[in-house]
């Protein structure tokens, strides 16, 4: 059981951390563009594009089950960590974009204008000026993404069979011929929750700053 737990724990850790980092990186770039530039895609403007990202959360996971199952089977991504990382990145990306868009909107544009006058490019101003200021929001988005991906069960149970199974799938499988093994399930659940509690305590000040950013003007 110990070896099985460690294997599932590392699967969850690798998948959750990688997908959260990827989502925060991509989401921050998208959110910065939506907060600073005026886009037009057909009839859609910035606000419509932002709402489109948020509307992806309306779809229940079961609606996406069959398409992803067929797609992953054709791409040989079933029961792989990279498959879960890509899927989890897509699932938390809309939330990251909304959090970071509000974060970037609360930062004065004069800072970037001054950086451009000093000779920096837009990308240089974003990476050296804006990102350090927006760090609390990025940490908050990372923690939220980490919690959501760490606790995700449906797709992990659907798209994995042995190698890439995660901790929630192992916790849910604590059943036998005599029913549910409550002691084992309780111990595994505590072990699964503990890392998130430790991370939240360590990064508490960033979470508070990030979630409060943009609340007042």
Short names for language-model regions:
Residues 1-217:
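A structural signal for multi-pass alpha-helical bundles of membrane permease subunits
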């Amino acid at each position: 059981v110990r070896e099985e737990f460690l294997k599932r724990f590392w699967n969850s850790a690798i998948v959750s951390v990688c997908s959260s980092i990827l989502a925060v990186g991509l989401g921050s770039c998208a959110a910065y563009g939506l907060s600073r530039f005026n886009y037009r895609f057909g009839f859609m403007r910035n606000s419509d594009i932002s709402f489109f990202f948020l509307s992806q959360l309306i779809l229940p996971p079961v609606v996406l089950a069959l398409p992803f199952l067929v797609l992953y089977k054709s791409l040989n991504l079933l029961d792989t960590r990279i498959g879960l990382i890509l899927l989890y990145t897509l699932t938390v990306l809309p939330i990251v974009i909304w959090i970071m868009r509000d974060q970037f909107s609360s930062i004065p544009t004069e800072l970037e204008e001054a950086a451009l006058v000093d000779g920096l490019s837009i990308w240089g101003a974003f990476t050296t000026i804006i990102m350090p200021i927006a760090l609390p929001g990025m940490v908050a988005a990372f923690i939220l993404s980490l919690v959501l991906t760490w606790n995700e069960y449906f797709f992990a149970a659907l798209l994995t069979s042995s190698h890439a199974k995660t901790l929630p799938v192992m916790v849910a499988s604590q059943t036998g011929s005599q029913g549910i093994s409550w002691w084992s399930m309780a111990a595994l659940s505590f072990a699964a929750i503990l890392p998130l509690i430790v991370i939240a305590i360590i990064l508490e000040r960033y979470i508070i700053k990030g979630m409060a950013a943009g609340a007042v003007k």
